[in-house]
């Protein structure tokens, strides 16, 4: 039940990142989120791709061509794994520097969200209470119908469905009413929070010491540094791919030549 209330709070207020302010868990850093997503994505591609290559090599055409794609695929994934390991510290340094530069702004925004959370909590508690009452009322109305079903079994199933339909619609309508009421109650606070965040950004833009232009320049500087530090790792990847591509090229040309000889011999 609390999860429903927390979800509604997120929808009415700040967006997906707001969930970290309404829960006790510490939020992941941007780098942690990027790293986790990239790891899952790359691993999924690697595993599924290897399966496809293995299936192709096991087919009649794959056996005839004998391209040894599976060996090349393993070499390729090893090169990508090495690249990921080399870039890890570099990207971590980039996120650390960026977070340090924006620490003051994030602290001010966190404080605004915490204050707004305190203001809207009574409305969320009231909504949760009303929702629990509606669910309990629905359960009380449905319970006798369940007894009828057990007694009459199949012949009364259709009757039960007909009786449950209006009850379900009633619960839906009453829930919609409570949600609309909650939205109306939270609207001023949502607007206040939006204005506060806009004010923070405007003040940041007008300040001489820490302007948005400064953040943009620093972020660009960090990205340039990241690009420079990544060049050696990318070059290593390119060098690692050359033997793989050359081996694939030789195997393919050999297979085509063999196929051409067989066609000419027929």
From Swiss-Prot:
The entry's keywords: Cholesterol metabolism, Glycoprotein, HDL, Lipid metabolism, Lipid transport, Lipoprotein, Oxidation, Palmitate, Phosphoprotein, Repeat, Secreted, Signal, Steroid metabolism, Sterol metabolism, Transport
GO MF assignments: amyloid-beta binding; apolipoprotein A-I receptor binding; chemorepellent activity; cholesterol binding; cholesterol transfer activity; enzyme binding; heat shock protein binding; high-density lipoprotein particle binding
Lipid metabolism as UniProt keyword: yes
One of the GO BP terms on file: negative regulation of cell adhesion molecule production
Protein species of origin: Carlito syrichta
InterPro entries the UniProt entry points to: ApoA_E (IPR000074), Apolipoprotein_A1/A4/E (IPR050163)
Domain of life: Eukaryota
One cellular component term from this protein's GO annotations in UniProt: spherical high-density lipoprotein particle
UniProt lineage: Eukaryota, Metazoa, Chordata, Craniata, Vertebrata
Residue ranges the record marks as coiled coil: none
Function according to Swiss-Prot or TrEMBL: Participates in the reverse transport of cholesterol from tissues to the liver for excretion by promoting cholesterol efflux from tissues and by acting as a cofactor for the lecithin cholesterol acyltransferase (LCAT). As part of the SPAP complex, activates spermatozoa motility.
Post-translational events: Glycosylated. Palmitoylated.
Residues recorded with modification Methionine sulfoxide: 109
Protein name, per record: Apolipoprotein A-I
Gene: APOA1
Transport among keywords: yes
Segments for region (10 X approximate tandem repeats): 67-266
